[in-house]
Amino acid sequence: NLKEICDEIFGPNCFVSNISWQRTYSKRNDSKGIPAEIEHILVFSKRGQWIPKRLQRTATMDEGYSSQDGDEHEWSSVTISAPGAATHQGMVYAIQHPITGELLYPPLGRCWSFGQAQMLECMNEWTDYELRIINDYEKRCEICGSDRGVSKETNAIMLKKPFETAQAEALNRYNQGIKKERPWPLLYFTAKGKGGLRRKQYLNK
């Protein structure tokens, strides 16, 4: 076993990774048995606890970062959804927009990137929210691509206060960011506060 031999030579604490790569990509019909298309490269470091040297950031990499809401840290806009709705059904639920009242869902086949507790915490920075059953089973099945395993009752993140009150608070919060008086929360709304939900990705993260 090459791994065991290398462990004796370099020390098991210097093992970094076993890199597997497929050396043949084109289809072949001349095999006389089971072809060995995968090769392995064992990587060891001179010293234990090896950390790769990261590339320095360039000005081009930083071009997409700014602070349009007066945040002391520059950020870029990234999606707040991730693939895998079918396998993360508990992360598929509605979030009520505080300014339009619309119910926001992840795109088809996707789920929210954060767990519901964290999403609720983020939304509470706009106005008061609560968890509530709204009977949107069919909509969640549509997003997950199937009704298999989808819970009949999943909480949505809904406005706790009357809509007019919540809307006024959220609009004030949004305008504070426009005036750069107070940065927007981690999750913010596009299209002058009336669009979809996005996440701030900070430059130093």
Report residues per predicted region.
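Class I S-adenosyl-L-methionine
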Residues: 1-205
